[in-house]
Amino acid sequence: MSRSNRRVRLGQARQYQPLRSPLRYGRRVDDQEFVQRVRRHVPASLVPIVARYGAAFSEQEQYFKRHSAQYAPWVLAEVARASLVYGTDFNRKPATDDDLLSCCAAYQSLPDRELERDEEGAVGNFFLRLAGEQLTFQQSVLNDLARTAALFEQTTPRKVLRTASPGWPERLLGCRLKEYVGAAILLHTSALKNAGTFDLKWLTQPNFEEVTREVPADVLRLVIEKQYMATREELRAIQQEVEGRTGVPNRDYRRFGFNPLSRRPVVAGLADTLVIPVPGFIVRRASPLGIYYSGMAQWGSGFSADLGELFEVYVGRQLDLLPDVRVLPEIAFGRKKGALSVDWFAVFDDCVVLVEVKSTRPTEPIRLADGRAGEELRRMLGHAVDQLSTSAGRVRSGEPGFEEVPSDRPMVGLVVTMEPFHTVNIPFTSSHLPQCDIPFAVCSALDLEHLVTVSDVSVGRLLLDHLTDPNKKGWSVSSALTGHAHGRNAVIDEGWASYPWKEQPEFTGGV
């Protein structure tokens, strides 16, 4: 079964015919002009229109067209943020659909100044920014949501966790994990079916009995209000808090920075109903990434360490799905066994894949591709690459403790990250990482979840051919999957099956 056929749709957006976009700006637009164009309109008028289009054009096939590309979710997300964070009600006009089109056209006319100046490294930085802006909205809804349960509830750690101990979701989120993700499924589906809106009053309507039978209405209301919802004032405060901690981006690249809707994707106080400008942010909030940020805010590095332990075991669970592999855990070696190898060795007939796991995600400097990006990449991924080289050397030398790992076949490596570093393998970006003794690639949890479902060829042979092909240097692991047959991912399916409404019942709120 192909990956596209396995995709779960949480709701089907209504068909919507967009206004055709004439050439609104035959010139470059700077960030200040873009923000001022958005600020012409009352947020309570503009943002609900953004939500209507966000629901209608949430899927790639809907906005990957000539006359609807201006309504891509990353464009709408920035229009909504500019209105909510910088907008005002004083002396402003109501917005129309045509006004939204002009705001989106202004956004698309924003240049990349570094690229224009043809500075050294400008092309690589441009792709870093572009990937962080756009590819976040092109991930699998099924995998991102199912991974939450599969990682946090269905993966057994090998040691006692410091903060993520039994009952931690209730302490952190105020509810069980399935209720937290269930609320996201409900909000996402409602947004797509109800023009980007949700009304809390719907929870007590008779047509919601199928929903509230699984999760009580009062629980859903509490979760939505406490974990997903914010007013304009609260969103502004979140923006200011993050910028106070990470710094204010260069004005030319402000649009690539933090968006408070990623933390609180449901807006209250604009209308009689709740407004959901960008449905994709609902999924992000309920994914392991969203929970990571909540856990870090409350518990700090203790939660990060627990997540690292869980993610390492989770990667092992994914590798165990392969039918033709022997998976070996990390090896303690050296004086008093104080040194550790890579986290996993996947032994195939054709090769050995060394796997180092990093529960990390791109930070603000990487998303902005600013002067700190190279240092950040080295800090987050450099040790993982060194681990591949060190462990490969130990295998070759037959060091005590490594006897189970065959030294008679080629070795390749994977650095598996929690979240995608989309362009990290291209030569410009990978030049910031240490040299490695074996061919390797950085891949995300999502890439691995898809890789292990390949059913028409050994994954070991697939990786060996892909990573040693000089014509594919810098290609992503996901590019190696094109044209191959895929089965189901049992770990992802088990995670999804733990949620309420997994059969996707029809609920359309007040419509």
Model-derived features with residue positions:
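Acidic, metal-dependent phosphodiester-chemistry machinery of nucleic-acid enzymes
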Residues: 1-309, 313, 317, 321-322, ...
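Active-site beta-strand-loop-beta-strand hairpin of nuclease catalytic cores
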Residues: 346-366
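A short acidic/basic microdomain associated with nuclease active sites
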Residues: 320-338, 344-347
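Extended, hydrophobic alpha-helical segments in both membrane/secreted and soluble proteins
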Residues: 315, 340-344, 355
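Short His-Asn-centered micro-motif
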Residues: 330, 416-419
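Beta-sheet entry/capping signal
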Residues: 326, 343, 350-354, 410-414
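Short acidic, S/G/P-rich loop/turn micro-motifs used as interaction or catalytic elements
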Residues: 361-362, 420-423
